Amino acid sequence: LTNSLHNLGLLLQSDFENAHIHFILRSTPSDIYIEGDEKQLSQVFLNLLKNSMQSLEGKTDGQIEVTLEVTNKLYIRLLDNGRGIPMELQEKIFVPFFTTKTEGTGIGLSLCRQIIKRHGGNFYLQESRQGKTIFVIEWPVASFILK
């Protein structure tokens, strides 16, 4: 999982640089393995990173931070310092085909949630306000291996 996220960061590195976005990946421990469909999980993380990038459009000090933390569960937090999600829209963002964008279908976050649930995890918005949005993916201990 850590390697996949690192590779996505490398894949998007020129996009991050062109958009003045600083990408940070923090993982303790460094090697975490999840049994599942690597393509689907990569699709989830790519979608979340792209959404964060869109929320940072026009900023010159954009930051996206992905943190992997193991306690009684594996927590993956994706934080950005973008424009945030208005309170009145926060309940709607996981509804299929809901979008506020002029482009796109509005299935991204709904699809992400479905994929994570199929892999035994949970996916939710922890916090969003102007200048800070945090999405969380959590997996129970039985779903991952530390090496």
Residue ranges, per PLM feature:
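A conserved beta-strand-to-alpha-helix junction within the catalytic ATP-binding
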Residues: 1-10, 67-68
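Conserved catalytic submotifs in the C-terminal HATPase_c
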Residues: 17, 22-32, 69-71
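Conserved micro-motifs of the catalytic ATP-binding
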Residues: 33-36, 100
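Short beta-strand/loop element within the Bergerat-fold HATPase_c
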Residues: 61-73
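Short helix N-cap motif at coil->helix boundaries in the Bergerat
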Residues: 84-92
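Short alpha-helical Gxxx[C/S/T] motif in the catalytic ATP-binding
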Residues: 108, 112
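Detector for a conserved hydrophobic position within an alpha-helical segment of the HATPase_c
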Residues: 116-117
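Glycine-rich ATP-binding loops of the HATPase_c
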Residues: 120-126
